[in-house]
Design a protein with these regions (language model features):
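Transmembrane-helix bundle of Major Facilitator Superfamily
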Residues: 2-199
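Hydrophobic transmembrane-helix bundles of small-molecule transporters
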Residues: 153, 175-254
Length: 254
């Protein structure tokens, strides 16, 4: 009997911070964080022609301002989710949003293409820290609540709204202000979401967690990164080019 019990896996409990927070404010803050992450990926598209004139760069080169964010975000999404389970989702959200607000403000001061692309890569890293922690936090905050499905539905709907809202807000801003105004707006939204999460979102993490698989994480980042890069470069080289085929094959092998 003793040996049989030892074979039964014990569930991994969740450790919560003493602060319970307000569910409504917490949901609003988490949805605002998701809105920021998704919107920042689409708000830049409408600013590319204006950036081209201001930075004296071609539209093709400036496309990497959009793609750099997508690439770093997609490559680090899975490792960031695993890290939030170990380190704490609230802590991950605070670090990600603080970084997002600061880097977005720094991006507004860019005067060269390489600066803009580099900072967009960093913004993608911050977005990867934020996005998975929002959903997992909502699931825990609304655990046992009849509104849990509604909260998750609002989270998903916010992602869709962010995709559509980005070009609209970007167009309005560019109608009256310079191209860097889109980054100032994102910085302000990030700061507001940061303050709300600091007040309303409790800390949650697992008591026990599996050992962090560093080699597997590196391979995951490399594989997803290569796959996303191949898809991004498909319009430039074509599906049958050796660059795209090689990138996809390397991603599948990894």
């Amino acid at each position: 009997m003793q040996s049989e019990r030892s074979l039964i896996p014990t569930p991994m409990p969740v450790r919560r911070h003493a602060r319970s927070g307000n569910r409504g404010l917490a949901l609003t803050a988490l949805c605002l964080a998701v809105l920021l992450v998704v919107m920042d990926n689409t708000i830049v598209n409408v600013a590319i022609p204006t950036m081209s004139d201001a930075l004296n760069a071609s539209s093709t080169d400036l496309q990497w301002v959009v793609d750099a964010y997508t690439l770093s975000f997609a490559a680090l999404l899975l490792p960031a989710g695993k890290l939030s389970d170990r380190w704490g989702r609230r802590r991950m959200l605070l670090v990600g949003l603080a970084g997002f607000a600061v880097v977005s403000a720094a991006t507004a001061f860019s005067w060269a293409l390489w600066q803009l692309v580099t900072l967009r890569v960093v913004l993608g890293v911050c977005a990867a820290l934020i996005y998975p922690a929002t959903l997992s936090s909502i699931i825990v905050i609304f655990e046992g609540s009849r509104y849990r499905s509604l909260a998750v539905g609002l989270w998903a709907a916010t992602s869709g709204v962010g995709i559509a809202l980005g070009p609209i807000i970007g167009g309005v801003l560019l109608e009256h202000y310079a191209w860097n105004s889109i980054f100032w707006v994102c910085s302000v939204i990030g700061a507001v979401a940061l303050a709300c999460i600091a007040v309303a979102v409790p800390e949650v993490r697992a008591y026990r967690s599996e050992r962090f698989d560093f080699p597997g994480t590196v391979l995951s980042v490399a594989g997803v990164g290569l796959l996303v890069w191949a898809i991004i470069e498909r319009p430039t080289y074509g599906w049958l080019s050796w660059q795209v085929i090689g990138g996809i094959c390397a991603a599948l092998i990894i």
